[in-house]
From Swiss-Prot:
Compositional bias segments (type: Basic residues): 120-134
GO cellular component terms given for this protein: cytosolic small ribosomal subunit
The protein's name: Small ribosomal subunit protein uS9
Family: Belongs to the universal ribosomal protein uS9 family.
A single GO BP: translation
Molecular function GO labels: RNA binding; structural constituent of ribosome
Keywords annotated in UniProt: Ribonucleoprotein, Ribosomal protein
Taxonomy, superkingdom: Bacteria
Gene3D superfamilies: 3.30.230.10
Disulfide bonds: none
Region (Disordered): 114-134
A UniProt-annotated Pfam family: Ribosomal_S9
Length: 134
């Protein structure tokens, strides 16, 4: 059984987790088992799509790989960030020489910001109930 050459990267953002497989090809996109013309058909927002494929753009590898992505959790914004990190990490497996370019654009950094939990006695994480002196 011949194994298909591919590159793998995991990305996380907020509560979203993306597992990204890059395979040499002509730019086909498959997200959660469903074929798409482009990532824009999945994200439905050009800003999220641009954010997700940014690693391919800055390394001039757009159209060189077929993307197979499994993403779950979070919303579309968090998923786009997770896909972005996953693609960047997979590109590093493909070519270690891309590291300075990806690092320059801060694509190898996991965004640590998470939603702060709500505390009892408060309306939200930090918003206290209105205070009245009299």
């Amino acid at each position: 059984m011949a194994s298909v050459i591919g590159y793998y990267g995991t990305g996380r953002r907020k509560t979203a987790v993306a597992r990204v497989y890059l395979r040499p090809g002509d730019g086909k996109v498959k997200v959660n088992g469903k074929e798409y013309e482009s990532l824009n058909d999945y994200f439905k927002n050009i800003a999220w799509t641009k954010h997700a494929i940014e690693p391919l753009e800055v390394t001039n590898t757009i159209g060189k790989f077929d993307l197979v992505i499994r993403v779950n959790g979070g919303g579309l914004s968090g998923q786009a960030g997770a896909v972005r990190l996953g693609i960047a990490r997979a590109l590093l497996q493909y070519d270690e020489n891309l590291k300075p370019v990806l690092k320059k654009y801060k694509m190898l950094t996991r965004d640590p910001r998470e939603v702060e939990r709500k505390k009892y006695g408060l309306k939200k994480a930090r918003r206290a109930p209105q205070f009245s002196k009299r």
